[in-house]
């Protein structure tokens, strides 16, 4: 056990997880109508108490600003009335989605007449470790409840007041609908030791999902004894092929880089085919400079861009470290590549496996890129910002998985279930 984790905290977190498991057993038996009614009531309560949640969030925002939190993280931390309303609307959307629990994945009869069915069932107790993302508290709660799971949350110190206010709204709604408030709990009261305890709580928590920066995710993956679904940091690439529509590419890149810089689906790297580099790089550099984006470039890109006399440009030579860095800031790495093969090799070497985009009109280039890129999501002629559970129609998301086991890409309701085999017999015995 970690030196920073006392036996008392570990035991307390395990007790919370066990309480959640007992509450989850009842939730797992609830029908879809009951779960949907619960979600709609939670959404209404969030709207009713949005000002209270905003007030708690204002205190978290003030403290985080005083502690020097950067602009990207502050944007993620903000949970004002409009964002609470958007989260509540997301809960309502989850209520409209098909319930995956009880779905028959496949079924067939054996030659001896035994009927086998593979059926979707809840995972159980889902642990979530995240940071400065109060919307995740609502998203995860709604997805867990609809999919029949309990949630144990460590939302981090920066959003502790906001998360407490949000869970304070959800708990009485659970009880009013005949469920236990222990279905959705926080371990924030234990600080970092709470997260450590969750990672140690194998046999109490069924699966653990980290959501945040690369440091947080890797710490959980390396140290957790509980099975982990790895959500990835986003070292996201856009490749401009020689066949690409350059006029179309500029707004795509600006959207992908600047709409929200602190999110995992924001573009971080731009690769440009050498045949269009001289024409395209001055155009995109000017557009990025206007958006106050700092450019980290290879030598070829630097030479082309520096000769364009672009006003307000912050142009720098990239280091090897740049190609592996998720900036989460107004910064972008740019590299000229000789061909599609080199672009694909560079992406597969340096990507975190999240999302990559190609701007191209040549069908063969598009097909090769989409087949060979080893990432969870590949986008053609569109912004990388579309990698999102809400955009994909999931209502919300548990996270975006960059691993290949169990789930990959945005994780919605179906990805929060596992399966159970049921055999229906009439007295069969094995010979």
UniProtKB/Swiss-Prot annotation:
It is found in: Cytoplasm. Transmembrane segments: none annotated. It catalyses: L-glutamate 5-semialdehyde + phosphate + NADP(+) = L-glutamyl 5-phosphate + NADPH + H(+). Keywords: Amino-acid biosynthesis, Cytoplasm, NADP, Oxidoreductase, Proline biosynthesis. GO terms for biological process: L-proline biosynthetic process. GO terms for molecular function: glutamate-5-semialdehyde dehydrogenase activity; NADP binding. GO terms for cellular component: cytoplasm. It comes from the Bacteria. Its EC number is 1.2.1.41. Coiled coil: none annotated. InterPro entries: Ald_DH/histidinol_DH, Ald_DH_C, Ald_DH_N, Aldehyde_DH_dom, G-glutamylP_reductase_CS, Glu-5-SA_DH, GPR_dom. Signal peptide: none annotated. CDD domains: ALDH_F18-19_ProA-GPR (cd07079). Pfam families: Aldedh (PF00171). Belongs to the gamma-glutamyl phosphate reductase family. NCBIfam families: PRK00197.1, proA. Catalyzes the NADPH-dependent reduction of L-glutamate 5-phosphate into L-glutamate 5-semialdehyde and phosphate. The product spontaneously undergoes cyclization to form 1-pyrroline-5-carboxylate. This is Gamma-glutamyl phosphate reductase. It comes from Bifidobacterium longum subsp. infantis (strain ATCC 15697 / DSM 20088 / JCM 1222 / NCTC 11817 / S12).
């Amino acid at each position: 056990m970690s030196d920073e984790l006392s036996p008392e905290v570990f035991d307390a977190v395990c007790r919370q997880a066990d309480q959640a498991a007992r509450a989850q057993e009842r939730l797992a038996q609830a029908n879809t109508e009951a779960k949907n009614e619960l979600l709609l009531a939670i959404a209404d309560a969030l709207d009713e108490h949005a000002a209270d949640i905003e007030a708690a969030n204002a205190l978290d925002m003030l403290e985080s600003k005083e502690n020097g939190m950067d602009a990207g993280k502050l944007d993620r931390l903000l949970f004002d009335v409009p964002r609470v309303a958007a989260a509540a609307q997301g809960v309502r959307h989850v209520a409209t989605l098909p319930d995956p629990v009880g779905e028959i994945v496949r079924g067939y009869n054996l030659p001896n007449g035994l009927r086998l069915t593979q059926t979707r069932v809840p995972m159980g107790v889902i642990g979530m470790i995240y940071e400065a993302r109060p919307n995740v508290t609502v998203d995860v709660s709604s997805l867990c409840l609809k999919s029949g799971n309990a949630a144990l949350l460590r939302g981090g110190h920066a959003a502790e007041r906001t998360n407490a206010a949000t869970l304070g709204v959800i708990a009485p709604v659970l009880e009013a609908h005949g469920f236990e408030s222990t279905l959705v709990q926080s371990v924030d009261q234990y600080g970092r030791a709470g997260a450590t305890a969750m990672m140690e709580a194998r046999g109490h928590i069924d699966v653990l999902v980290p959501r945040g920066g690369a440091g947080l995710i890797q710490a959980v993956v390396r140290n957790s004894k509980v099975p982990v679904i790895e959500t990835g940091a986003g070292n996201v690439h856009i490749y401009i092929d020689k066949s690409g529509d350059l006029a179309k590419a500029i707004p795509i890149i600006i959207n992908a880089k600047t709409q929200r810089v602190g999110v995992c689906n924001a573009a971080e790297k731009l690769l440009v085919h050498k045949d269009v580099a001289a024409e395209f790089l001055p155009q995109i550099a000017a557009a990025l400079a206007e958006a106050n984006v700092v450019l980290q470039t290879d030598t070829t890109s630097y030479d082309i861009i520096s000769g364009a006399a672009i006003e307000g440009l912050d142009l720098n030579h990239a280091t090897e470290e740049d190609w592996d860095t998720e900036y989460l800031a107004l910064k972008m790495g740019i590299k000229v590549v000789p061909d599609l093969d080199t672009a694909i090799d560079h992406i597969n070497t340096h990507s975190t496996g999240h999302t990559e985009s190609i701007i191209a009109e040549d069908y063969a280039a598009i097909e090769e890129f989409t087949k060979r890129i080893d990432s969870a999501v590949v986008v053609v002629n569109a912004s990388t910002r579309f990698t999102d559970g809400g955009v994909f129609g999931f209502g919300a998301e548990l996270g975006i998985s960059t691993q290949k086991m169990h789930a990959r890409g945005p994780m919605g309701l179906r990805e929060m279930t596992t399966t159970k085999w049921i055999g229906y017999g009439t007295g069969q015995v094995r010979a």
